[in-house]
């Protein structure tokens, strides 16, 4: 063990070590989330968590870090940028024949990377303590990471419920290290949303039902990632070409003009997932899906839900015979997929018929003009 440091020195060192490990910011807070408990309970009571039963099952444990690791006195909260240099947001979203994957999922799964870095941070702290118990968390345990990040001074909660930072926007991952030493804590920052409601207005499905409250049952991220069954039919047309997650509420946010690019190679987009053709994705076998998504967050939804999401996007695409053929080719593989294929085919046929009407109408209008030209002026 190295020479023990006093707690103020240690807190300073922890932030320095965190930066050296690749985190963009490190903050420290206590474990008191009592103010968040009523909000969490109200959210659960309204069933806004949808089918994410684990949220209700863990209940208030999420707001009590000291119960996750008995003896915990402080939470070290960290953030790491994930925005790649070639994100290509607009070009992908504007092309309905391409599949849009939320930019956090284009590269390697962040859970393992952040957890390993947090573990290293814990081991570095351990070298300067007589004794230390620690436990890293990365979006994988019942813990309210955003309120903790807010208390630790990493940013404020935006109306889309994500953490916003004045120098970095919101395109970053969060992680926590629970420790049992009474480090000095950081102070929250002032919120900066003001009267802006851009995120609420832009949400394709109206999932941000009131400021700071998201009804997950309407959120495209929930529908494409967490929901195991059929996507509600009334929401399918609103999903566009978003096949895994959604970034709209972040893209519209004025604070994301200050977003910083990631320095992690692991977060660079994988070519098969970056602006891919929907028809090509829909042709993937399960073997191909597992190969391409190895080490990716996408893999956890499985091949079936992947195809379900793409079927919806194909249904939202402009009429194309090749799309219709692609949809027909996967009929009969699974009832869940069949339901979404049938819907998508109906959408495609409806657009084809609309195209026929649009073509016929100008021809009729031209014929009327020709006849009118041949008539006497006083006819």
Curated annotation (Swiss-Prot):
Its cofactor is cob(II)alamin; [4Fe-4S] cluster. The active site is at 139 (proton donor). Its EC number is 1.17.99.6. It is found in: Cytoplasm. It is an enzyme of class 1 (oxidoreductase). One of its GO terms (molecular function) is metal ion binding. Binds 2 [4Fe-4S] clusters per monomer. Pathway: tRNA modification; tRNA-queuosine biosynthesis. Its main location: cytoplasm. This is Epoxyqueuosine reductase.
């Amino acid at each position: 063990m190295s020479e023990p440091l006093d707690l103020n020195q240690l807190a300073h060192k922890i932030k320095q070590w965190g930066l050296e490990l690749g985190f963009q910011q490190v903050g420290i807070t206590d474990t008191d989330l009592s103010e968040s408990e009523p909000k969490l309970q109200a959210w659960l009571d309204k069933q806004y968590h949808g089918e994410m039963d684990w949220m209700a099952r863990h209940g208030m444990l999420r707001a009590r870090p000291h119960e996750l690791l008995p003896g915990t006195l402080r939470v070290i909260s960290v953030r790491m940028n994930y925005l790649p240099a070639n994100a290509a947001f607009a070009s992908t979203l504007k092309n309905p024949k391409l599949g849009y994957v939320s930019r956090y999922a284009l590269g390697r799964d962040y859970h393992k990377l952040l957890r390993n870095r947090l573990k290293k941070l814990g081991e570095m702290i351990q070298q300067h303590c007589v004794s230390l118990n620690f436990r890293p968390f990365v979006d994988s345990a019942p813990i309210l990471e955003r309120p903790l990040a807010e208390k630790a001074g990493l940013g404020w909660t935006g109306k889309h419920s994500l953490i916003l930072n004045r120098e970095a926007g919101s395109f970053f991952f969060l992680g926590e290290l629970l420790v049992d030493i009474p480090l000095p804590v950081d102070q929250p920052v002032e919120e900066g949303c003001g009267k802006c409601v851009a995120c609420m207005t832009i949400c394709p499905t109206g999932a941000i039902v009131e400021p700071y409250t998201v009804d997950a049952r309407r959120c495209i991220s929930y529908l494409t990632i967490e929901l195991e069954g059929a996507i509600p039919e009334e929401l399918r047309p609103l999903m566009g070409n978003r096949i895994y997650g959604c970034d709209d509420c972040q893209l519209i946010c004025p604070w994301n003009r200050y977003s910083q690019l990631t320095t992690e190679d692991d977060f660079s987009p994988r070519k098969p997932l970056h602006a891919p053709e929907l028809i090509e994705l829909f042709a993937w076998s399960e073997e191909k899906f597992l190969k391409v998504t190895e080490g990716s967050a996408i893999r956890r939804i499985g091949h079936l839900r992947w195809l379900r999401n793409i079927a919806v996007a194909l249904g939202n695409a402009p009429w194309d015979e090749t799309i219709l053929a692609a949809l027909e080719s996967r009929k009969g593989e699974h009832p869940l997929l069949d339901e979404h294929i049938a819907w998508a085919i109906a959408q495609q046929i409806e657009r084809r018929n609309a195209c026929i009407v649009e073509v016929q109408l100008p021809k009729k209008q031209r014929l009327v003009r020709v006849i009118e030209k041949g008539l006497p002026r006083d006819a």
